[in-house]
A protein has these predicted regions:
Chain A
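N-terminal helix-turn-helix DNA-binding module of bacterial transcription factors
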Residues: 1-60
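Short acidic capping loops at alpha-helix termini that bridge into adjacent secondary structure
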Residues: 179-180, 210-213, 263-270
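Flexible loop/turn connectors
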Residues: 230-333
Length: 333, 333
DNA sequence: TCAGGAGTCGCAAACGTTTCCACTTTTTTG
DNA sequence: CAAAAAAGTGGAAACGTTTGCGACTCCTGA
């Protein structure tokens, strides 16, 4: 269990441990013969440099804190995957924290991460209030937000262009011949407000009537989409397509439609948003708008690295374009 | 960016920094009046203890390395969720690594984790060869494996009782009246061998004929399940139920069945394994065997903590019972 | 022969903690 | 009331590394 230190290999090599350190770090001020000898010896003795000691003197941990509401969520786990890959490729490691159900938890984990001396924090906010919640810490360490739109805040973030996503989607529906399109789902939270706006903008441009259906406290879940849709379908259906603010809600609506024998897409076209993995499943095949998760993750760690390594001040808002994924829940009229 | 240290608050409080350290750590050998004064001061000055310095002297990082083939995977992200929660509740943080596509990557990240001085490692193996692959490191740090069955290896692990899972499932099918049950999918890798064994045992006890269908290099994916199933259905269907070794494969089979107008469950009952989240989706509703992921995660970190904190030697094999989730792809004959 | 420079290498400080030991002050006890 | 015990505090070492600076060796050229 006792690991071998610099001092150990120094002793074995008959040099000072400064020399060993330099040999490993590729310092130019060292003989190439001794360097090789030492490197070989390190290998034999199974020496690996102790990162916590190193961090101590370098005042840099090469650690990035990743805080997500809960990693057990398609969007976030996918994001985490690419973030970790990209970070590691650049010599960083990821410290993972679930910011749990409430803001208190979120603040706690950020505090922990600070104590751990992470070089930067990547956070996907759990609510629009997150910014205020951790404001006190974001100036102590480079931070970039992912996926929640902080528009007016002086904070770096990368996000999908939600507004453009719904715009593209309704345009697609229009081109398919639909003239009565219902927007279904959440409208509060910045993200969902933007999605609604994209729909509204498209309607305006195309001369369509804007029609919304949502309950005040709607959440993005299949169960809730189902409940909402059952309520919705109890009224006459005087629209030919619905744009769900979220894939989960769309899936819930799908379930309700099945039960009520409303055929999708024959009677009703349906389009969602997020491209969660479930949408590509057999029997589902939901047409949707994809958030470019891979790019978001990569851009986010790039931004963070820039802040860390170059000390870049200020902030940048990186907006990525979503794309339409055509599957089989929409049909031409 | 410059954070406040022990020395800073010591100066402000007019005491030595040993005293401040003691006040914070709740040492008994300190006056309760000075303790309160110091704690209040720390709060005001926004002091948080530097964990890397602390780790240095304590020779303990309170860090657990979590290595998974890829976090963007239902099973693993869910596992990671519970593991992180449980770990943090006990004062540990999680360092996340994807062990990537190959064994080389897996070895690399384990090495990194060792350099980071993690107190322990939680690893879900990417292949049966994982054990051999990282053998050299597992005796340098407490390690527990998750979900791959290392039966004969002197290594701690927690896993679902795969064999029992398939046993329960086929028994269920039998009780429903099925007498011709086909086992569909992978059979190599320890896990899947065990699953196959459970099916075989049930068949033996119940006097059923064992029937297998699989391709040599089958993987657990919907696409592959689909391909296999198309091939399968090109032969006459002289069985009334199929047990898929994996939910993903089951879903692929479902898709093929739909295309060939084979009705499930009317013509064919279907049962999967894993209870991935997709199985509970509308239109799918796959009957399956659930791995108790939450329990697995919690047990795993408990085992690891025991090794870390109590220096427990030896190894334990923790086998958890899977449960049958009845949904709508099975019907009584 | 020797000054001086290039090329190597060692010494020691520093990073921010925790904790052992010693020391001072206060309290208890005989 | 003196001595011993207890309580509270400070000094300093230690953890394993990086790196500035000084020192040493060796060689070149005058």
């Amino acid at each position: 269990m006792k690991s071998v230190t610099l001092k150990d290999v120094a002793k074995a090599a008959g040099v000072s441990y400064a020399t060993v350190s330099r040999a490993l770090s590729g310092s130019p001020q060292i003989g190439s013969d001794t360097r090789e000898r030492i490197i070989k010896l390190c290998d034999e003795m199974g020496y690996t440099t102790n990162y916590v000691a190193r961090s101590m003197v370098m005042k840099k941990t090469d650690l990035i804190g990743l805080v997500v509401p809960s990693i057990d969520n398609q969007f976030m786990s996918e994001l985490a995957y690419y973030a970790e890959m990209s970070a590691r490729a650049h010599g960083y490691n990821i410290m993972l924290c679930n910011s749990g159900p409430d803001l208190k938890q979120e603040k706690t984990v950020v505090k922990i991460l600070l104590g751990r001396q992470v070089d930067g924090i990547l956070i996907v906010p759990q609510s629009p209030k997150t910014y205020e919640n951790i404001k006190a810490y974001t100036d102590q360490v480079p931070t970039v937000f992912v996926s929640e739109n902080l528009r007016d805040q002086p904070q770096s973030y990368v996000a999908a262009d939600n507004s453009r996503g719904t715009y593209i989607g309704t345009k697609y529906l229009y081109d398919l011949g639909h003239r009565d399109i219902l927007y279904f789902g959440r409208r509060h939270s910045t993200t969902h407000q933007l999605r609604a706006e994209g729909y509204m903008k498209a309607c305006q441009e195309l001369g369509l009537k804007q029609r919304f259906y949502n309950s005040e406290y709607s959440r993005s879940s299949i169960a809730h989409g189902y409940e909402m849709a059952k309520e919705l379908f109890s009224h006459p259906i005087d629209y030919t397509a619905v744009f769900a603010s979220t894939d989960s809600n769309a899936l819930g609506l799908l379930k309700a439609a099945d039960e009520m024998h409303i055929s999708i897409p024959d009677q009703l076209s349906l389009i969602g948003f997020d491209n969660i993995s479930a949408t590509s499943l057999p029997r589902l095949e939901l047409t949707t708008i994809e958030q470019p998760k891979r790019n978001m993750a990569i851009q986010a760690v790039d931004m963070l690295r820039d802040k860390i390594e170059n000390g870049t001040q200020g902030y940048v808002h990186q907006i990525l374009l979503p794309t339409l994924i055509k599957r089989s829940t929409c049909r031409a009229l």
